[in-house]
Amino acid sequence: MDKDKIEVLGARVHNLKNIDVVIPRNSLTVFTGLSGSGKSSLAFDTIYAEGQRRYIETFSAYARNFLGNMERPDVDKITGLSPVIAIEQKTTNKNPRSTVGTTTEIYDYLRLLFARAATAYSYQSGEKMVKYTEEKVVSMILKDYLGKKIFILAPLVRNRKGHYRELFESMRRKGYLYIRIDGEIQELTQGMKTDRYKNHNIEVVVDKMKLAARLGETEDNLSQRLQKTVATAMRQGDGQVMIIDADTGEAKFFSKRLMDPVTGLSYKDPAPNIFSFNSPEGACPHCKGLGMVSEIDLKKVIPDDRKSIREGAIAPLGKYKSQMIFWQIEAILSKYDLDLKSPVKDIPQEAMDEILYGALEKVRIAKELVHTTTDYFVAFDGVVKYLRAVMEGDESAAGKKWSGQFIADVTCGECHGQRLNREALSYKIWGKNISELSEMDLGELYEWMGEVENHLGETQRQIATEIIKEIRKRIRFLLDVGLDYLSLNRQSASLSGGESQRIRLATQIGSQLVNVLYILDEPSIGLHQRDNVRLINSLKALRDLGNTVIVVEHDEDMMRAADWIVDIGPRAGRKGGEVVFQGTPQQMLHTHTLTAQYLNHERAIEVPARRRKGNGQHIALCGCTGNNLKRVDVELPLGELIVVTGVSGSGKSTLINETLQPILSQHFYRSLKKPMAYEKIEGMELIDKVVTVDQSPIGRTPRSNPATYTGVFSDIRALFVGLPEAKIRGYKPGRFSFNVKGGRCEACGGNGYKTIEMNFLPDVMVPCDVCHGKRYNRETLEVRYKGKSIADVLDMTVNMAVEFFENVPQILPKIKSLQDVGLGYLKLGQSSTTLSGGESQRVKLATELSKRDTGKTLYILDEPTTGLHFDDIRILMDVLQKLVDRGNTVLIIEHNLDVIKLADYIIDMGPEGGKRGGQVLSTGTPEAVAKSKKGFTPAFIKSVLESAAKGRE
């Protein structure tokens, strides 16, 4: 076996055609080719799957039972395989407690830094907290109170509610005679208690003494006597002692723990878990460390105040039903000479407060309604309390989904979104608490960490140096992959696929592993051209540690920087799955594969000869301040192809996906998603609908497929129902569905396969032995159109189906639209779980294309080129250009220069990411923006336009 290479022999997974591939060890290798050509099948479903299988096989049979199905990929042999780590583009963690800081473990080091080197301040007085040894406390008391009468007390309760009967009894049994309650010294008596609903401060009187030497007593003897008393007080007071001057009544606190010398407030000794919002020790008690709390949103409870309550104005209650809650509301309204038919906007606020938050007195229900001999009086707690009871009492998924319609997440009023309790937020280093550091951009935090050592004391510096060095090293890896605009408190769930992938990449570089095979799926997603060089250098750094790096990628810079390229093709789907080239980038330039033709400029996506002027109308969005936006005003010219550009984190998604799109969705579809802050929008009446086409899956079960998503499967079933054989048998459309009983194969439930449980071995998926994977029973399959059964139709590729249904006008347009967006290779019945993000997006786009448009539609696409080859981009852009030619407006967020150069109008944002971004730098045609001196995008646009001009010459 050659140790210098990894060999894949006879790979046949999905559409791969028994291919052999050689990958040099310790190289940066790029797998490229058209979308659907088989790159991911080779990288993830063959190489990674086999690596995982071999790893799992080292476990015991018992352990393997818990690790799910790891069947052997369809490949003859893979030699030279190292341990494999896949870094995919999925946002894997939806847990609201997961942040950039916790994922990268930087926050763990930050917690350690604060536990060891931070200075504590009192959240009550702002004073620096102090702590003393027992000996120091005794010497300070002697110094301050020598010759004076003092009370020595042990603090027991600080500002807490309760009757404390057991505490008083316990102190009495220990022999104590006096207790101080809320500043007043009282004799301890049997059965003593306090008002349980009030906050109390309680101290037990340990001793009363005059600090003067008795007859024949030395100063040392006095000190020892005081030390015994102080030690007793500290044992009772959990490390604290309180001294009261008997003459003046002035109180002073001393403590072995951190303590406020003014108020006596005491902190526990700092430990890393005090600074964790995932620990009860550190989390804000109100929001439990989430930074947000769920509140009932009255706008969602009463979405339309023009309706009456009888018509369903109070959404959780719905329309009038003869139920107690409606009788109670009617009784309240009758006091104001109103009834359930009155529009909510006409009901006085006082009455609405009673309806929402509860009536002050019991309401009278007429005896006729409750079928009793007398009127019925009942307390009414209000709709809001009723909703809260449902929220807290119904733990079912359906119950949570129902109550979730009326809830909004708002910033916690106690910690103001900082997640930690007051004590944790009171520790500071160079004037900053841990939450303030977590809010900084990583670039800003890196600089702060570089300077902070100069502002630490000598002892602090010695403790902190190594921790700071580790934090800076980890931040540096994140900066190197273009994530300087993120902050440590950014939720993992809010990251794009590309961002979360690059975070995992940075984490792997930081782990310093060697002899590992890394497989990455398009790490350049969402990355501006400016940051591409840094990403490539990071991948090379991973390689130079002694690892092999495989990247599934379409980016030209990445291909040119690679050591080795494997080009899969020649086309996609059944026409792909072959190795059309493997070798160095220099060798590839001398071939004529489709990829090579784009790299050596034999083919190119042409810059249009002229830019559209639009229809002269526009949508104006003003005063946007969400996230990092700085009062952004923007005009979107209608009837044009608009591209929003800018470095990662500059505010593109905030402006379009989080502000504009929710505003339009609320306007047209009454969407509940709230837009980010803005002042006004004008021109919505100029469009008639908004269509958002993203890369989320078209379905999450194997039963979903392109035919069901586009709706063409309903038309196909209707066609089969209309056939003479189906009419004779009396078949209805449900007969041709694999989701309901009747026509499907009941042996496999319409899945086409069975899952065989192997107990201590992984489950095995085998084709159904009754229907042989066709999903339907024999009777259903006997109905044929042009000699093909419904199962045969689902097994057709889109290209085959276009020919097959060319004379069926109800079906052809929907299938043709799939072909038009470059998905001719997909099978109509292909499971949606096997589609890539780019394929899912194009299925959605095809679905929208097959619908009629009025020429007044706004289409919003976020990075539609993800997962697309140069030629796929050409096909996609041709489709989008046709939409604009019909009078529609297409708005794209994009980094890809092949898309940017086709724009009629560019909105460039920046200049940087995060806090240093959030501004519109330049707008206009690509030619106009290329002349701008602001930001990084103009230089790249200028370069690509000049290259296009040379290509035309």
Residue ranges: model-predicted function:
Residues 1-953:
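Conserved phosphate-binding elements of NTP-dependent enzyme cores
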